[in-house]
Swiss-Prot record:
BP-aspect Gene Ontology terms: fatty acid biosynthetic process; negative regulation of DNA-templated transcription; negative regulation of fatty acid biosynthetic process
Swiss-Prot/TrEMBL keywords: DNA-binding, Fatty acid biosynthesis, Fatty acid metabolism, Lipid biosynthesis, Lipid metabolism, Repressor, Transcription, Transcription regulation
Protein name: Transcription factor FapR
Stated role: Transcriptional factor involved in regulation of membrane lipid biosynthesis by repressing genes involved in fatty acid and phospholipid metabolism.
Record-stated family: Belongs to the FapR family.
HAMAP family, per database record: Transcrip_fact_FapR
Length: 189
């Protein structure tokens, strides 16, 4: 692996983050053959925020106008991709305030809220309400884990005011939640 001067590394670091704002400090450290701490110091020197803040910024700029059914700041987790009426993806980092103190396991309502708000966000109408939800918690989620929720909209049925959204939440490649959300939707008059 080529060793870069500090100046060259910082220039290439800036380009790498511009090309992929979702790249982690660990991935950058591996890419440039330096420690994670060196990458963090480079980011601070270049005034580049940490991954979490970059994701929030990209999501708020990119998806704030796309999501019609609820304000973007009411979505639980951060939307990283959305195609209205088709699919959406969000991430949620489980922190100490989301877990039971005695066993560090995430409270189920946080997983449900991420899945439900993603199912709501993918609906292209101003009014989107959950009429029914069937949720199965597959395994517990622990503090420090990142949940990636993926929503897929089923093709329309006879009742055009009801849409079914399937949501699967993952930690890594492991499914932690499966949900089927029946969504009523309408345009505000």
């Amino acid at each position: 692996m080529k060793k870069y001067s500090k100046k060259d590394r910082q220039m290439k670091l800036q380009v790498a983050i511009e090309e992929n704002p979702f790249i982690t400090d660990e991935q950058l450290a591996e890419k440039f053959g330096v420690s994670v701490q060196t990458i963090r110091l480079d980011r601070v020197a270049l005034s580049i925020p940490e991954l979490r803040e970059r994701i929030k910024h990209v999501a708020s700029v990119t998806y704030a106008d796309a999501v019609k059914s609820l304000p973007i700041d009411e979505v639980i987790g951060e939307i990283i991709d959305i195609q209205l009426s088709k699919s959406a993806i969000s991430i949620f980092d489980v922190r100490s305030e989301h877990v039971f103190k005695r066993n560090k396991i995430a409270r189920g309502h946080h997983l449900f809220a991420q899945a439900n708000s993603l199912a709501t966000a993918v609906i292209p109408n101003e009014i989107a309400l959950t009429t029914q939800a069937t949720v199965r918690f597959v395994r517990s989620v622990n503090e420090g884990e990142r949940i990636i929720a993926k929503a897929k909209v089923r093709p329309a049925t006879d009742n055009r005011a009801i849409t079914i959204v399937d949501v699967k939440s993952y930690v890594g490649d492991e499914i932690v939640l499966k949900g089927k959300f029946e969504m009523y939707h309408a345009t505000q008059k």
